[in-house]
Swiss-Prot record:
Superkingdom of this protein's organism: Eukaryota
Protein name per UniProt: Protein LSM14 homolog B
InterPro entries: DFDF, FDF_dom, FFD_box, Lsm14-like_N, LSM_dom_sf, Sm, TFG_box
Ranges for domain Sm: 1-81
Compositionally biased spans, kind Polar residues: 368-382
UniProt keywords, alphabetically: Developmental protein, Ribonucleoprotein, Translation regulation
Amino acid sequence: MSSGTPYIGSKISLISKAQIRYEGILYTIDTENSTVALAKVRSFGTEDRPTDRPAPPREEVYEYIIFRGSDIKDITVCEPPKASHALPQDPAIVQSSLGSAPSASYQSSVPYSPFRGMPTYSQLAASSLLSQQYAASLGLAGFPSIPLRKSPMVEQAVQTGPLESQAQKKVQQAKGAPVNQRGIRQSGPQSQPAPLNVPPAAAPVLGTVNDENRRPPRRRSGNRRTRNRSRGQNRPTTVKENAIKFEGDFDFETANAQFNREELDKEFKDKLNFKDEKPEKEGEEKTDSGVETQNSDGNPEEDPLGPNIYYDRSKSFFDNISSEMKSRRTTWAEERKLNTETFGVSGRFLRGRSFRGGFRGGRGSATPRRNQTTQRAGTGRV
């Protein structure tokens, strides 16, 4: 490109080394930093050019993009600069700007000085191209999320200003409608702030700011705690006042010293009304085996062991510990009647078996069946 041609303001088609084509209006050319700035840029993708990473075209129009000169493959002028209805060359005019923001970017196409009245690309954040109204009308809030940095020569994407200034504007707009602590709007004339042209995507954000200002902070913290808790944790916990507290370890020696076995045996016999039927003899102790117990035949059982001797291997295999169960022993007829009253009439009866015989037959009935199966398997009979 020759230096005599006024390319500023013309429509440029630029192809990067990543084979992505961009179209935009030439804004500035920085020879010191070797950068080219385009305004109103649109990406057309790779367009079937050979590349390892193909990119589809995008419909978004970016406010400006600054390209690195070393990463530009080809530049083509598509359209000459549009004729602008500028003011006559009056030496009294130092600088002028039109009412609309887009027309201010084409003031640089004055033939006598293309760079007069035009700020450099480093001052674009304060220029009319990045004004709040123009950025809101194009919806530039969503541009930082566009993955344009796949191309290595894109140095800087569209910026909408620092976040702190935007947050201050939102807070000021939220404070524009004063509200009492009780939630009642104040009556009378109120000064309304100047309306901001905010895109629809930013409208819910302002609504949440107003809601947060109206809610007390304690209520929000309480709601936040209740979300993380389950229903059972919200209920007040009751502490038992009559909890048993143990001061030290249990002393077994002291407990054994207080434990008298003979006195407990006497109390136990008195409660059960034990009767001693055997006569006492001279020089012999009174036996404890005179408890009347009846079996199924009605004959009393005698204790084969001596007094206070609960198990003697030489006399009998059985012990004398379960004497309480002997006094409460019932016949098979009584137990069958009790089972019928409790569980009802069963579908299968034990034919001709007493309680003890039926019990042994129930447990031992599987043994002859296994023996019969073994004999059949051994003899080969089916």
